[in-house]
Amino acid sequence: MGLEEELLRIAKKLEKMVSRKKTEGALDLLKKLNSCQMSIQLLQTTRIGVAVNGVRKHCSDKEVVSLAKVLIKNWKRLLDSPRTTKGEREEREKAKKEKGLGCSDWKPEAGLSPPRKKGGGEPKTRRDSVDSRSSTTSSPKRPSLERSNSSKSKVETPTTPSSPSTPTFAPAVCLLAPCYLTGDSVRDKCVEMLSAALKAEDNFKDYGVNCDKLASEIEDHIYQELKSTDMKYRNRVRSRISNLKDPRNPGLRRNVLSGAISPELIAKMTAEEMASDELRELRNAMTQEAIREHQMAKTGGTTTDLLRCSKCKKKNCTYNQVQTRSADEPMTTFVLCNECGNRWKFC
C-alpha cells in the first residue's frame, strides 16, 4: 500500500471517529502520521490536515490534542517553508486556485474566479455559434471555427457538475481556510457568516486580526455550550451576526476586533448586552414610560398598609372589593401596589 493510500485510509478513520464522537485509537493513528515523511503534494491530495484538525477540536484526550497540534504546526511550517522546490510551489499555487487548500497564504478571491469565468464564457460561446451558422458557405473557415469551439469546450469542462470546481462547490471550499473547518457543513457556514460580519467594514484591517480565526473561536464557544446545531444554536449565531453587522452599533464590532470583548463573552451575551448605548437608553425610556402609564391607570380604592406586596415586599397598597360571584359568596379583593405597580387578587 502506497503512502498516499495509507494517508487517505487514516483520514477516513479520523473523520469517522469525529462524526461518531468516539476517538479511541486516534493516538495510534496520529503516531503513524508523525512517523510519515509528509510532502506538500500529499497534504493537498489527501486533506489529512482537515481530519487531524477535526480530532484536535473534538477530542478530550490531552495527549491526542497535543500530538494533533504538533502535527498541524509541522505541516504549516512545511507549507510556509521557503526551501520548497519551484515545481512544488507551482503545484501548491495551482492547488490553492482550484481547491482552496492553502492555509497561510489563502485568499478568497482565487476561489471565486471560476464562476466569473463561466459567466463571461457563455456569451462568447453563443457568438461563436452564430458565426459558425453564418459561415456555412465558406468551407475554409469552418475547420478553424470547429477547432476554436473544441478548445473552448475543453476550457469549460472543469465547470461541469461532476468537476470539483463547480460554482456551487468552489465557494464553499475557498471561503474558509482548511485549518478552520469543523467537518460539519452547518458549523462551517456559520463560521463563514461570522467572519463576513466581522469584515463588514474595511477598517477591520487596522486591527491586524485574523477574522476567520476569531469567527471560528466564537462559533466553537457557542457549540461547546449548546452541544448541537439545532434552532437554538442557529438563533444564537444569527443574533451575533445581526448585531456585528448593525451600522448603528459599530462599537460592538470594534470591541470584538480589538479584544475588549473576548470570543467567549460575545458567544454568551444577550441581546440587551449587545445593544448600542442609544438603543439601551431608548429601551430604558420606554420601560419607565410603561411603568408610569401602568401606575396612572389605577382606579380609586382604599389605601392600606396591612397588605404586603410579594414583589417589592412593601406595604403601600390600594385595594378594591368587588362582588364577582353570587351574593352568598365572599367578595373578591383586587390589590394594587403603589410602589412597583404589581397587581393581585384574593377572596
From Swiss-Prot:
Zn(2+) binds at residues 309, 312, 337, 340. Liver, kidney and heart. Residues 132-142, 157-168 have a biased composition (Low complexity). Coiled coil: none annotated. Residues 186-302 form the TFIIS central domain. Signal peptide: none annotated. PROSITE patterns: TFIIS_CENTRAL (PS51321), TFIIS_N (PS51319), ZF_TFIIS_1 (PS00466), ZF_TFIIS_2 (PS51133). One of its GO terms (cellular component) is nucleus. Necessary for efficient RNA polymerase II transcription elongation past template-encoded arresting sites. The arresting sites in DNA have the property of trapping a certain fraction of elongating RNA polymerases that pass through, resulting in locked ternary complexes. Cleavage of the nascent transcript by S-II allows the resumption of elongation from the new 3'-terminus. This is Transcription elongation factor A protein 3.
